């Protein structure tokens, strides 16, 4: 079994790659050193490099994302907007497009790492929230476009990486009393990779956060 993980050197992506390897997958963990997938040619090259190294492709996990710093919507710049959509939405589209033929051949799976910020409005993370919402729609678009040979699913984690002074607050927003971990996301990836009758849907991995009051959403 052969997997490409974009954002594979980040905290969440590396946990996904490590878990897949532990389960016997051959993994190509793509990071910035392999190219900026916000660039179309770089995105295609990353896929080709992975296919050449692995001998094919059974799973694409798109975990690449931006590192947006929260700010009021009045202060968001064009550069902020472009950076948010670059690796997340644009990169997700063109990496999946490039991988599609290989995944059709293997009957493979695409898993988009979305975010609960793409399912609810977070004003202080406007570009990131909008980019993740776009990625959520791409999950559905590709599920229809690549069926029946390829399944496409999404995972929307709640807060996973937070500042130490915010951990208690974020944990209180979860019904389970803690924030998520990269391993929680990796568990969901393994489930969806083997869930043969699941496609076109997003699995929310947030400890029940979305069931809490919308008043907890920061402004």
How should these model regions be labeled?
Residues 71-73, 80-82, 170:
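Substrate-binding pocket helix/loop in short-chain dehydrogenase/reductase
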Residues 96, 131, 139:
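Active-site helix of classical SDR
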Residues 101, 143-148:
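Alpha-helical segment proximal to the catalytic Tyr-Lys
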Residues 182-205, 210:
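C-terminal substrate-recognition "lid" of short-chain dehydrogenase/reductases
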């Amino acid at each position: 079994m052969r997997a490409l993980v974009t954002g594979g050197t980040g905290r969440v992506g590396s946990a996904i790659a490590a878990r897949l390897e532990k389960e016997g997958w051959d993994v190509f963990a793509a990071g910035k050193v392999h190219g900026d997938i916000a660039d179309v040619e770089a995105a295609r090259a990353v896929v080709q490099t992975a296919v050449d190294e692995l001998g094919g492709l059974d799973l694409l996990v798109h975990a690449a994302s931006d590192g947006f710093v929260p700010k009021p919507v009045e202060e968001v710049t064009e550069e902020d907007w472009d950076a948010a959509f670059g690796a997340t939405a644009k990169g997700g589209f063109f990496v999946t497009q490039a991988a599609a033929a290989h995944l059709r051949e293997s009957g493979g799976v695409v898993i988009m790492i979305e975010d609960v910020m793409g399912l609810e409005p977070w004003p202080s993370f406007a570009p990131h929230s909008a980019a993740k919402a776009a990625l959520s729609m791409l999950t559905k678009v590709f599920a229809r476009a690549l069926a029946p040979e390829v399944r496409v699913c999404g995972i929307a984690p709640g807060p996973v990486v937070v500042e130490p002074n915010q951990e208690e607050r974020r944990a209180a927003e979860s019904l389970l009393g803690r924030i998520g971990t990269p391993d929680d996301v990796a568990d969901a990836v393994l489930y969806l990779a083997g869930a043969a009758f699941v496609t076109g849907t997003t699995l929310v991995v947030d400890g029940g956060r979305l069931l809490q009051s919308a008043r907890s959403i920061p402004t």
